């Protein structure tokens, strides 16, 4: 990685490039270790063949797991079970197509969560926090299943947000749902900042130093009014 800067400095001295530094910030990825937590090597017998993983679970599941496995810049042990989990997650995304309603809008009960998820996934991608972006999408899918349905608007947004991590299945689903055009050429969904802010918060009711109940109150309610 240091060579990128070394060669750039050399080119700068020759007057080929306009600036002294090649980049404002450099991020290097961590190492994927064997399942035993040690560095992968043939002598240790803990090498994972990516071709075999793709043949078994598919390229999308493999790609999603690689980005979900941990923080981008941290070394993390491999887990075939974790890859299987990402494969099941994509299966759930695929099966959602049978639960889609005709509404082009977000459902009232999930509107706030949709805007929060759009904001989080976009911000996390820019900050190279891919693992937490995928986690947010997993949570969103869980909410769709809890509700028992997903609107066309919600499903379209989900596919666009998931596309950077699982491009093949999302593009296929986008076409199957007749959303129009290609997913890769679609605009990133916008969010309303006001709708990312919780309107109510949960507060514990304590009696005698012990929590006796929990109530929901407006987020902007004054402390005296709550009392």
Across the structure, where does each feature detected by a protein language model lie?
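Helix-rich, typically C-terminal accessory recognition domains appended to large enzymatic cores
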Residues: 16-22, 52-216
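Generic structural signal for hydrophobic residues
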Residues: 3, 7, 158, 169-170, ...
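Generic "edge-of-domain/loop-turn" microfeature
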Residues: 33, 210-212, 222
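Glycine-rich, small/acidic residue-mixed loop/short-helix segments
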Residues: 217-227
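Short clusters of small/polar residues that mark proteolytic maturation junctions
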Residues: 44, 216-217
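Amphipathic alpha-helical transducer elements in NTP-driven molecular machines
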Residues: 47, 87-90, 223
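Alpha-helical recognition segments enriched in aromatics with Gly/Pro capping
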Residues: 1-72
């Amino acid at each position: 990685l240091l060579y990128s800067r070394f060669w750039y400095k050399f080119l700068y001295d020759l007057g080929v490039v306009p600036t002294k530094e090649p980049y404002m910030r450099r991020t290097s990825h961590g190492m994927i270790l064997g399942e035993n937590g040690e560095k992968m090597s043939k002598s240790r017998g803990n090498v994972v063949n990516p071709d075999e993983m793709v043949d078994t679970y598919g390229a999308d599941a493999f790609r999603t797991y690689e980005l979900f496995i941990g923080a981008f810049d941290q070394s993390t042990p491999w887990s075939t079970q974790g890859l299987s989990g990402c494969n099941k997650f994509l299966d759930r995304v695929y099966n959602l197509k049978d639960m889609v309603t005709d509404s082009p809008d977000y459902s009232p009960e999930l509107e706030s969560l949709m805007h929060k998820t759009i904001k989080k996934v976009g911000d996390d991608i820019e900050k190279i926090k891919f693992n937490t972006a995928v986690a947010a999408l997993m949570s969103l899918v869980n909410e769709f299943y809890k509700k028992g349905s997903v609107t066309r608007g919600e499903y379209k947004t989900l596919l666009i947000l998931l596309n950077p991590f699982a491009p093949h299945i999302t593009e296929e689903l986008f076409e199957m749902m007749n959303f129009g055009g290609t997913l890769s050429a679609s605009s990133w969904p916008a969010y309303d900042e006001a709708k990312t802010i919780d309107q109510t918060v949960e507060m514990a009711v304590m009696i005698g130093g012990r929590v006796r109940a929990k109530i929901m109150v407006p987020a902007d309610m004054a402390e005296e009014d709550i009392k």
